[in-house]
Amino acid sequence: MIYEREIYLTDPAEKAKVVEFLNGFGLTFTGNIEYTMGLFSDGELVGTGSLGGRVMRDIAIKESFQHKGLTHRIIRNLKSESMRRGIVGNQIFTKPQNVPVFEHMGFKCVAVAEPYAALLESGQDTLEDYLTRIRSLLGSGEGKNRGAIVMNCNPFTLGHRSLVEYALNNCDEVIIFAVQEDRSVFPFADRFTLIKQGVKDMRGVQVVSGGDYIISNATFPTYFIKGTEELSAQTTLDATIFATRIAPALNISVRFVGEEPSDKTTLAYNEAMRRVFSNNGIDFKVVPRVQKGDQVISASAVRKALADNDMETIRRMVPKTTLTYFSSEEGKRVIERIKLEDKIKELQAKEKAEKEAASKKVEAEAKKTKK
């Protein structure tokens, strides 16, 4: 008899069983997991599935128990738990060949990024719901040359503003999609406000949330593909959703990005966009980054300056609206967090260096002893 129950991830032994089970399927049990369930036969784990927010993930069934309707049981369990948590719509990732399986369970395919991944969804708060909301805010955009920029702005800098100015000089309208995923040191609500304040004097610029479909936990799945394929899967899926669903619905003809000479993820993302957009008739413009003297303006440079109390550098890199925010209570709390995280990194680096030095000393002593 097969029974199902929650797997308590706070129990190391329970979690270890799930990790080992998923490893057998080439799945990595990492990331923002809030709930995991298991199917058991005579005490043996034979199937599992998890929730990370509204995303269903890490669904796997032991080979000898497949084709017995157990996938339906896992999905039913995860949907029930989602409803208990107030989640009215789910998303799921799978490999392209598995799309028909989940379509038979009522999921609709959002996009497929061959040969890596597919995103499906069911319930409310779907991509169409998101696009309907955004269209009501923006208007149709018909007859206009409409461009788009996706920004995280952690925080908003003069470099971001320069990118918007460049886009506006080349388009009738510019839509800024603010990355909604709250994994940055500056909270989404604060970043969204900083962007709006930073461009409020620019006619033809509108700021909207990127929702669950632009650089989010939904479009950047990090858990079911190992090795070098992971980054290609993430970037290609995100670019495909934008090119095939978002851009056509909002009459976007061009997307602008800032030049990124060194960050591996951003370089891969830009390359994926260049490839996918060219196949879908969307222009892709890479804009050189702005410098102040010999220093490139970047959000990471601003965060470093905040950690170092380097107000001279900060004033050179951010607009007055961002500078004013730094003096607010919300801004001060974020700055304290930045300083704390910077201090922790310093201590960790020091500890690592000391361990390496001690290890080298032991090795040197051992060599002397052998002689």
What are these language model-derived features?
Residues 65, 69-77, 159:
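Conserved acetyl-CoA pyrophosphate-binding loop and the N-cap/start of the following alpha-helix
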